[in-house]
Amino acid sequence: MIPLKMLLLVTLLLGASLQVTHAARGTNVGRECCLEYFKGAIPISRLTRWYKTSGECPKDAIVFVTVQGKSICSDPKDKRVKKAVRYLQRTWKGGPQES
């Protein structure tokens, strides 16, 4: 019976340490990360700016900000996303706009 108690204790401690590690990593990650990409049509005429998510984020993403201040997470490899970025670069004469 002692090995079962020891196994339970080790499992409990391991689970608790993983939760602490996960929370700490989340704190150090940038202000905003995208967990999934928007799959609909990108309203190009309603976009005001764009930026790339932090390299520390689990997924590379381009974030578009609309005139209403809403953020749209997008796949940087998607041709519609590339088209929207080119549009904003021509409109604003530059690269990613800082938030």
Curated annotation (Swiss-Prot):
GO cellular component: extracellular space
PROSITE patterns according to UniProt: SMALL_CYTOKINES_CC
Disulfide partners: C33-C57, C34-C73
Keyword Disulfide bond: yes
A single MF term (Gene Ontology): chemokine activity
Leader peptide range in chain numbering: 1-23
Cellular compartments annotated: Secreted
InterPro entries xref list: Chemokine_b/g/d, Chemokine_CC_CS, Chemokine_IL8-like_dom, Interleukin_8-like_sf
Biological processes annotated in GO: immune response; inflammatory response
Tissue specificity note: Expressed in thymus, spleen, lymph node, lung and heart.
Pfam families found in the cross-reference section: IL8 (PF00048)
Superkingdom, taxonomy of origin: Eukaryota
Key words of the record: Chemotaxis, Cytokine, Disulfide bond, Inflammatory response, Secreted, Signal
UniProt record similarity statement: Belongs to the intercrine beta (chemokine CC) family.
Role summary: Chemokine, which displays chemotactic activity for T lymphocytes, preferentially Th2 cells, but not monocytes or granulocytes. Therefore plays an important role in a wide range of inflammatory and immunological processes. Acts by binding to CCR4 at T-cell surface. Mediates GM-CSF/CSF2-driven pain and inflammation. In the brain, required to maintain the typical, highly branched morphology of hippocampal microglia under homeostatic conditions.
Protein name stated in the entry: C-C motif chemokine 17
UniProt source species: Canis lupus familiaris (Dog)
Organism lineage: Eukaryota, Metazoa, Chordata, Craniata, Vertebrata
Record gene name: CCL17
